[in-house]
Amino acid sequence: MADHEQEQEPLSIAIIGGGIIGLMTALGLLHRNIGKVTIYERASAWPDIGAAFAFTGIARECMQRLDPAILSALSKVAQRNPHDKVRYWDGFHPKSKEEAQDPEKSVLFEIEEKNMAYWACLRGVFHAEMARLLPERVVRFGKRLVAYEDGGDQKVVLRFEDGEVEEADIVIACDGVHSTARRVLLGAEHPAANARYSRKAVYRALVPMPAAIDALGTEKAHVQIAHCGPDAHIVSFPVNNAQIYNVFLFTHDSNEWTHGHTMTVPSSKEEILSAVENWGPHIKELASLFPEQLSKYAIFDQADHPLPYYAAGRVALAGDAAHASSPFHGAGACMGVEDALVLAELLEKVQNGSAFKEKKSNIELALKTYSDVRIERSQWLVKSSREMGDLYEWRYEDIGGDGVKCKAEWERRSRVIWDFDVQGMVDQAREAYERAVVKV
């Protein structure tokens, strides 16, 4: 093939994992007409995930830059907090539901909601909206990655569990907390190859709004709130246009996790009630709304062993594969959105600015730049998020259940998330890449 023809050959980009960040990354690349994008999803079809989560204003700005259609999809399904504050309530000491609903008696601290500006949604509903935006034949289901090889001048070779072998110029692994790509990239024996149990677990329930109102009161049930107490805390908010109330009950676990990489084990309402048996009556009533049989979800993260880098050669990790985080900042997925934006911006520069013979080295430079730009902020989040879990559960040294101290610590840490310059991040990535290319 002649050189001028080779220059027109599009990059082939494999995205491993079709979760929220995998889809966003794909849509960001497709929006920029970057190469031929293929998502390899291990499931046989899109899973119906009922869990809820939320995105900050910073994350939504990144979505808009990735592809405005992503933000439109979120807007269709998101629940906004109608109040200007998020309150953190004492779930432990109130002796009556009336006392528990009295802000003067039971609010530990409150935060201006405008700073984080969360939009909450059901994960599966938002995922379905984004999936509709994908062109046909972009997704291949039933493709569980088992290994890859990245060497020489050839493309990256991907090996799947079904025996199929594929090739790509670039691999972006969004394959989650227990990432196969991470283990290959770092080596199976590397301390950071596997996420570790954070000693926190969570139980989830979607309860009818009338029952939530009975337990918490009308005002509390219609906004995002948290209840704090010893060794546990509850985060709850309305979803699905306030028809359903989403409840997460988090607990501290002093035991090791004995189920390997299995993150979900059967549990029961009895375990929930035991965790809050000495709490206020409103919390016990809310806990009683959980189903009799439910699941206990272990929270794994990379706080004990952060990754030394997020990219090697022509393979990059993004989202939980790079920086698996506990959910206590409410910003783990938001960090993945930032990852996707930086990757899209840098790969656009590779495609538009590289001759064919330079593309391999420039791909590697772009992915290294991505890693360098994203690693400090995202790893700070992983560490701080685990510590925030202890803060909510009155385990943080010298603070305990002191609402004034809790608020000061919350604001100090959370400001790092919301006081962030997205354009500055993009400019930093572009400029660092351009400097790297010049040096070659």
Curated annotation (Swiss-Prot):
Molecular function (Gene Ontology), one example: FAD binding
Major location category of this protein: membrane
Names of required cofactors: FAD
Enzyme Commission number(s) from the entry: 1.-.-.-
Transmembrane segments: 10-30
Residue sites binding FAD per the record: E41, L145, D320
Keyword Transmembrane: yes
PANTHER family assigned: FAD-BINDING DOMAIN-CONTAINING PROTEIN-RELATED (PTHR46720:SF3), HYDROXYLASE, PUTATIVE (AFU_ORTHOLOGUE AFUA_3G01460)-RELATED (PTHR46720)
Protein name: FAD-dependent monooxygenase afoD
Naturally occurring in which organism (per UniProt): Emericella nidulans (strain FGSC A4 / ATCC 38163 / CBS 112.46 / NRRL 194 / M139)
Lineage summary: Eukaryota, Fungi, Dikarya, Ascomycota, Pezizomycotina
